[in-house]
């Protein structure tokens, strides 16, 4: 794939404000940064760049729609033929973009491959702000753990969700003046969208009864691509369907669907595969589920919010808990 690197038509407004480049690439980044992006546009001259890491509409565009976000100013289309090409494209494309637009600062969130765009910013001496800094699960088999360590170390300002995460960074050698506790922005995002979430008609559309279904999300590389983990996970899903005898709605990412099809694994008849849902629909399902089973890092934050507003969701997380 030939990577488009012509950003000559992309520019800041040059309105005298700090020029901030925000880089995203996946669903979790878009969701968590939604309120932050809108607030930053009030104070800074902002450009929003999307690497294209999540290239499916249901993992990308639907969230800009639901969260009422302006479309990205730049779409890098950096997905390559394999992981190495994609990672290289992300670093290359973001570097060329920064050379062209000359931002005063770069903001990223989390631990995805899109966050590796800050490597170019470091070489160009552009200050880097990293939200969700200091999170650790201490399992180096997970690709996100490597990304977390890289981005934390080279960022100029690490914005942590908790005092625990800040202390961890300080203990590992990151200077105190480079670490700040801001908390997670998820509560603001969910609060701003709570009316739309509660008014979703997704239960009627899917013919599900509130409190009488289990919501499943499983997409992590180590759970889907590793044969042993894949078989263990979906055997457990089938056992869960049999034990509880209720529908299990599986929000199935494209890679997970392909893996299930190629393996020939037979899911229990009560497991319903569904394409990934939008923000309002999915969270309405989550807040009214009998239980939520997920390997996502975002869903525990969402479910904890719904518990605080009176909706109980039970959570099982396949990834070791991120200490934050």
What are these regions (language model features)?
Residues 21-24, 29-36, 43, 63, ...:
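Active-site and donor-binding regions of nucleotide-sugar-utilizing enzymes
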Residues 53, 61-63, 198-288:
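Donor-nucleotide binding loops and adjacent catalytic segments primarily
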Residues 283, 300-306:
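Short alpha-helical segment that forms part of, or immediately flanks, the ligand-binding pocket
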Residues 315-324:
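Single conserved hydrophobic/aromatic residue that forms the stacking wall/gate
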Residues 129, 292-294, 298-299, 309-314:
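Short hydrophobic beta-strand element within catalytic cores of glycosyltransferases
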Residues 2-53:
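N-terminal subdomain of nucleotide-sugar transferases
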Residues 2-9, 53-58, 77, 154-227:
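A nucleotide-sugar donor-handling region in carbohydrate enzymes
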Residues 104, 271-272, 287-298:
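Acidic donor-binding loop of glycosyltransferase active sites
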């Amino acid at each position: 794939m030939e990577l488009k690197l012509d950003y000559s038509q992309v520019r800041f407004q040059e309105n005298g404000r700090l020029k901030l480049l925000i880089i995203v690439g996946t669903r979790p980044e878009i969701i968590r940064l939604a309120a932050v992006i809108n607030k930053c546009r009030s104070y800074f001259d902002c450009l929003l760049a999307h690497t294209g890491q999540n290239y499916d509409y249901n993992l990308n565009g639907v969230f800009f729609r639901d969260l009422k976000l302006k479309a990205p100013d730049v779409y890098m289309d950096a997905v390559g033929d394999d992981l190495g090409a994609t990672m290289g494209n992300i670093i290359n494309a973001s570097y060329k973009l920064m050379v062209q637009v000359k931002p005063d600062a770069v903001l990223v969130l989390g631990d995805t491959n899109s966050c590796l765009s800050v490597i170019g910013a470091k070489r160009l001496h552009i200050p880097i702000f990293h939200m969700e800094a200091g999170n650790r699960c201490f399992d180096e088999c997970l690709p996100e753990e490597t990304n977390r360590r890289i981005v934390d170390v080279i960022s100029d300002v690490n914005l942590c969700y908790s005092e625990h995460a800040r202390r961890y960074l300080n203990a590992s050698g990151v200077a105190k003046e480079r670490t700040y506790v801001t908390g997670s922005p998820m509560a603001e995002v969910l609060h701003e969208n709570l009316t739309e979430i509660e008014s979703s008609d997704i239960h009627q559309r899917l013919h599900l009864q509130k409190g009488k279904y289990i919501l499943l999300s499983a997409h992590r590389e180590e759970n889907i691509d590793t044969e042993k983990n894949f078989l263990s996970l979906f055997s457990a899903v089938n056992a869960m369907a049999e034990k509880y005898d209720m529908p299990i709605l599986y929000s199935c990412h494209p890679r997970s669907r392909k893996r299930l099809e190629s393996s020939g694994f037979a899911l229990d008849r009560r497991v319903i595969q569904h394409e990934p849902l939008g923000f309002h629909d999915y969270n309405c399902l989550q807040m009214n589920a009998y239980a939520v089973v997920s390997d996502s890092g975002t869903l525990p934050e969402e479910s904890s919010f719904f518990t605080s507003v009176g909706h109980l969701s039970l959570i099982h997380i396949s990834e070791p808990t991120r200490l934050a």
